[in-house]
Amino acid sequence: MGWKEAAAPVLTRMPAVERPEGHVPFRRKMYWTGGVLVLYFFLTNVPLWGIQTAGNDFFGQFRSLLAGGQGTVLQLGIGPIVTASIVLQLLGGANLLGLDTDNDPRDQAIYQGLQKFLVGVMVVLTGAPMVFLGNFLQPSQQLAQSMPGGAFGVEVLIFAQIAAGGILLLFMDEVISKWGVGSGIGLFIVAGVSQSLVGGLVFWEGGVGSQGLLPTWFDIIVGNVSNMPPLLSGSGIEFLLMQAGILGLLTTLFIYVVVVYAESVRVEIPLSHARVKGARGRFPVKLIYASVLPMILVRALQANIQFLGQILNSTLASMPTWLGVYGGNGQVTGGLFYYLAPIYSPNAWMWWTSGATAARWQVLIRIAIDLSFMIIGGAIFAIFWVETADMGPDATARQIQNSGMQIPGFRKNQGVIEKVMERYIPQVTVIGGALVGLLAVMANMLGTIGNVSGTGLLLTISITYKLYEEIAEEQMMEMHPMMREMFGGGD
């Protein structure tokens, strides 16, 4: 008996959100999407009951990307979902699952059940060390005195809350995927990054360097900034670029323009209908063919590596210096985990500034590792993404063949169409994945409004762009119901 036969009775009965029986009207989809987003914002502001303080956010640079809230019910964010996706993509890429998710409905149900099971496992593997080992969430000593089991009982209560939040986020994503518009994970990332961007623009407390861009410039204009250097001097230019937020603003605008332009760059393969004379179309192969979503997987892998370092630092009595050196604030400052940590702000690599602590050679090695990790990892995960999302040459050729279309000048044969697609899709996938990885590192190094991670900004712009396209498509199907069949919208 294989693993499928043994696991099928359990995996096919995993809880799931029921699929709609027919076409869901656009307005109802927007209601579902808006309702889930309101619930998401509510949960990111519900503090965990039983913690002493939220503590230092050791994963602040990944917070917007993982769409979580420090010290809240959504402490884990989409981390377990993304990590489970990484495991599934690696297993599927190595052909170890033996599942035909394209043609066999039973294998599809097993795959979806396996995904939910792995998410549950990752919730435990991520949440348990965070509560019981890492001291990231300190239990309230006052509550521990009146709680059965003392501090351990409070820790169990905290773990139950973040585990429930992680599982609830999985089903919220499923609700949007089946009943709403877009992807739940994508919308949660957009929501988290948008909060940071708005705060980076209008936050009015904390003084220059820690408040928003608009209040900072208001203080500069009215002369409300103490010890401000002459603006035309070297220190004044550094002040304008770094503390006044000019560099972050320019980087944000630059990334926005590049991503929107890259989304519009495409190779269009002409198509014609085999039976309907004059019916023509084009199949677009975009420069960012795999989208920027594979970057979530790359950054999540980096986040898990840093999480392992934090766990080792808090549990080992004396951590080897070659492995990692951690400061009083919990941030890594040396060792292997330092070089594997992503660059997430200008201060992390500008060794000539006053706040720099690392030597030039250390910074250069770290930049080289981060660039290599993101560019190579972006290309590899883009390939995995294309294959698992049925966007590869074989799946695309099959979809074109089944739609009755063909490439003019070629025989109406799936193998012929596949060979034409192989000229473009694999190469564009690798180039697009590497380009997105490079842009993510550049955005992190130069800084953005609200200190949003470069990957989070890339994802937000790209997801918003695709969401706009999806909404336009949905409205077209509402206006012309006959278009649903062409887009696969059902009855």
UniProtKB/Swiss-Prot annotation:
Gene3D superfamilies according to UniProt: SecY subunit domain
InterPro entries: SecY, SecY/SEC61-alpha, SecY_CS, SecY_dom_sf, Translocon_Sec61/SecY_plug_dom
Keyword Mitochondrion: no
UniProt topology in membrane: Multi-pass membrane protein
GO MF, one annotated term: signal sequence binding
Ranges of the Extracellular topological domain: 48-58, 135-152, 203-244, 314-365, 448-452
Record field: intramembrane: 59-66, 67-78, 79-87
Spans traversing the lipid bilayer: 21-47, 59-87, 110-134, 153-177, 184-202, 245-266, 292-313, 366-385, 429-447, 453-467
GO biological process: SRP-dependent cotranslational protein targeting to membrane, translocation
UniProt cross-references to SUPFAM superfamilies, sorted A to Z: Preprotein translocase SecY subunit
Residues exposed to the Cytoplasmic side: 1-20, 88-109, 178-183, 267-291, 386-428, 468-491
Localization per record: Cell membrane
Keyword field: Cell membrane, Membrane, Protein transport, Translocation, Transmembrane, Transmembrane helix, Transport
One Gene Ontology cellular component annotation held by this UniProt entry: plasma membrane
Top-level lineage group: Archaea
Cited function: The central subunit of the protein translocation channel SecYEG. Consists of two halves formed by TMs 1-5 and 6-10. These two domains form a lateral gate at the front which open onto the bilayer between TMs 2 and 7, and are clamped together by SecE at the back. The channel is closed by both a pore ring composed of hydrophobic SecY resides and a short helix (helix 2A) on the extracellular side of the membrane which forms a plug. The plug probably moves laterally to allow the channel to open. The ring and the pore may move independently.
Assembly and binders: Component of the Sec protein translocase complex. Heterotrimer consisting of alpha (SecY), beta (SecG) and gamma (SecE) subunits. The heterotrimers can form oligomers, although 1 heterotrimer is thought to be able to translocate proteins. Interacts with the ribosome. May interact with SecDF, and other proteins may be involved.
Similarity annotation: Belongs to the SecY/SEC61-alpha family.
PANTHER family named in the record: SECY/SEC61-ALPHA FAMILY MEMBER (PTHR10906)
Record-given protein name: Protein translocase subunit SecY
